[in-house]
Amino acid sequence: GHLFQDPMKGTAPNMSIEENLALAYLRASAVKGKFFSRISQKEKQMFREKLALLDMGLEDRMKNPVGLLSGGQRQALTLLMATVVTPKILLLDEHTAALDPATAEKVLNLTKRIVAENKITCLMITHNMQSALELGNRTLMMNSGEIVLDIKDEERKGLTVADLLEKFKEGVGAQLDNDRILLS
C-alpha cells in the first residue's frame, strides 16, 4: 500500500466512499472477477466498521462522493484503502505534510495504530523529525541523496529532535537550516 503527500491523489473523487473502498479491496484481495454490484453486505459492513475507527463520521456517508470530503478525510480514507487488505509494506510519502496540524496528528495516530495492530512493515518519508521518532524502530536521515544517519532500536529510544539535529551535525559537519524541518 502507499499514500501520497497530496490528499487529492489516491482516491477517485467522483466515486463514493464505498466504491473507493470496494475498488481498493477488490484490487488488493484474492477475490478476482468481482464487480462493484457484487460487493456483499458483509464487505460493506467491514467498510463501515473500518470507517467508524476514523471517528470522522464517514461511516454514515458511505454513498457520498469522495470529492466532497476535506483533505484530511480523504487522506484518512486513502490510508484505509491502502490497508483494507493488510499489505506486506506500507509506503508513506509525506502523507501528513498537506494537512492542518490537528488533522495531521489524527492521521498519524491512525497510521501508528494500523501499522502496530497489523504488524505492517512501514517506510515513512517525512521532514517532520518528531513524527519520524514516534513511528517505527529505525530512523534514516539523508543529505544530498546520501544516508548520513542510521539509528536503530535501543539507540532511538528517548531521542529528541534536538538529539537528531546534533547527530546530523556530527555526521555531516553542518547544521540543518530548513525552518520547516526545525519547526516540525
Ranges and model annotations:
Residues 82-83:
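ABC ATPase C-loop
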Residues 94-95:
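Walker B catalytic motif
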Residues 104-117:
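Helical segment within the ABC ATPase nucleotide-binding domain
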Residues 146-172:
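Conserved beta-strand-loop-alpha-helix hinge in the C-terminal portion
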Residues 100:
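ABC-family nucleotide-binding domains
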Residues 50-67:
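Conserved ABC nucleotide-binding domain
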Residues 15-30:
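Q-loop/switch helix immediately C-terminal to the Walker
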Residues 126-127:
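H-loop/switch region of ABC-family ATPase nucleotide-binding domains
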